[in-house]
Amino acid sequence: MALRRRPSVSDAVDRSTPLGLIDYSATAPAVEFKNVSIAFDENVVLRHLSFAIPRGDMRILLGRSGSGKSVLLKLILGLLRPDAGTVLVNGVEVGHLPERDLLEVRGDIGMVFQENALFDSLTVAENVGYRLSEQATMPVEAVRERVAAVLGFIGLAEYADRLPSELSGGQRRRVAIARAMAPEPRILLFDDPITGLDPLIATTIDNEIVKLRDLQQVTSILVTHQIRDAFYVATHRAVWHDGAVQVVSADAASLPHVEFMVLHEGRIYFQGSAAELLASPDPYIREYLLLTLPPW
């Protein structure tokens, strides 16, 4: 089953909230940092960080271990609070929100970790629909239809009744992506989702990320240490062809909404397209790429 942007079943997904913090008709960036700093004891991780991600855009976040990539994601989720500056998600400042209000903001964010724990006693379909089933306002049949649509989009429809223990590592990662996208979040955060997978399986995960970006128009941040996969995602796009989805090569001009951000010493050291990153004469960027790029 092919999943197109906002299928009819999505009308059953409850977007109403008792708090009404988020105005989805507004034009505010999906994510915005304004002069954000955070430190742990004497270790300053982020220094006066400022950037904005328009809705529907993608940022691929690179940097050496300890550069603050995962900290940045936790700030977006409100799991950490900045020492200074402002973090906004869909126009809402999350840095000082109480936990009850943060639940509304997080309800529009999907998160995929390197090791997403699945419920071993639940089937694939039950895992994917778990968060939807908790919404009392969503009919059971609508949950089933949404789960079927998501599994069809991700290419795992035939695995709906299997248990996680019956899946390969790559299939489990794809189930984690399906679970994250089931509630139709407008923002998806990927924290090293490809690490530990062999190159062929990793490419299937890359393709799912590309499909979500281009066909579902979600705003996404991809944190990865896998430079090959980062460039693959930045140089491919998903298109419909003869009723099926294809992931094809693309140049930077056709993907203006995709940019790299390289963190170094707590700051955004570089921001630009894949071509601009590869062409950068900056000594640190050259050294970083030399140490991390595979021998193509």
List each model region and its residues.
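Conserved catalytic motifs of ABC-family nucleotide-binding domains
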Residues: 184
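Conserved ABC ATPase "signature" region
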Residues: 92-93, 140-159
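ABC ATPase NBD coupling module
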Residues: 94-110, 134, 140-141, 277-281
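Short coil-to-helix segment of the ABC ATPase nucleotide-binding domain corresponding to the Q-loop/switch region
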Residues: 122-130
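Catalytic Walker B motif of ABC-type/P-loop ATPase nucleotide-binding domains
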Residues: 188-191
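Helix-to-loop junction immediately C-terminal to a conserved catalytic motif
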Residues: 77
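Conserved ABC ATPase signature
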Residues: 163-167, 171
